Amino acid sequence: MNENVIALDGPAGSGKSTVARQIAEKIGFNYLDTGAFYRALTLYLFRLYQTSPNNRFEEWVKTSEAERSLSQIRIVCEFSAGNENRILLDGEDVSLAIRTPEITREIKHIANRRIYRDFVNKELHSLAKLHKLIMDGRDIGTEVFPDAKFKFYLTASSKVRAERRFLQLQEQGIFADRNEIEKEIILRDKSDMEREIAPLYQAKDAILIDTDILSKNSVISKILEILDQ
């Protein structure tokens, strides 16, 4: 049983990252946003694709050219005060660039391919050997670290999640439309749950928490209580 990893899974916008950051601070763990690795990988591949866009991006990522490029990518996560992750892509700080609606739309084409998931999972396991981590994602407790001692599954309605995402983007100075965000969230949920490889679902031994009906502080208190048991 892995006691150095706490897994928080759930759909996009369910409050995982906000909760995970605060819990990490309270228990002395580092917070790791696993989705940032997929976003950084998507950004890298999308930029490479744009240099010669002969096919649709979703088709291009299946090519040997795209897959071979994995050997050239270097993604680094720097932990900082406040449990913010600074994401460096080949030395460039892309912490904001990976959060744009454009990357959000394209990430599903990366997340549903085994070769890209294996690349990210290898990076996550390397970090877990060096740090005590609380991770949020889609398949942390089901595939990446099925041996994690503590697993939680956070969920919320698509409307509530869209509002959270809208406010987050607004704070970052990124313009977005609430209705479009909700549509993208619904499509992302469908893609995550129905994909062949590592679909989104609640692990049998994960504790379900509905963040629609609980405040952020209530969710944090509930998780801390379980961790103390």
From Swiss-Prot:
Q: Does the keyword ATP-binding apply?
A: yes
Top-level class of the enzyme under EC nomenclature: transferase
Give the EC number. 2.7.4.25
Q: Read off the SUPFAM superfamilies from this record.
A: P-loop containing nucleoside triphosphate hydrolases
Annotated residues that bind ATP are located at G10, P11, A12, G13, S14, G15, K16, S17, T18
Q: What domain of life does the native source organism fall in?
A: Bacteria
Annotated compartments: Cytoplasm
Coiled coil (UniProt feature): none
Reactions catalysed: CMP + ATP = CDP + ADP; dCMP + ATP = dCDP + ADP
Main subcellular location of this protein, as a coarse class: cytoplasm
Q: Which GO MF terms are attached to this record?
A: (d)CMP kinase activity; ATP binding; CMP kinase activity; dCMP kinase activity
A Gene Ontology biological process noted in the UniProt record is:
nucleobase-containing small molecule interconversion
What family does the Swiss-Prot or TrEMBL record give for this protein? Answer: Belongs to the cytidylate kinase family. Type 1 subfamily.
Q: Write down the NCBIfam families for this protein, in alphabetical order.
A: cmk (TIGR00017)
Question: Can you say what this protein is called?
Answer: Cytidylate kinase
Q: Which organism is it from?
A: Leptospira interrogans serogroup Icterohaemorrhagiae serovar Lai (strain 56601)
Q: Which gene encodes it?
A: cmk
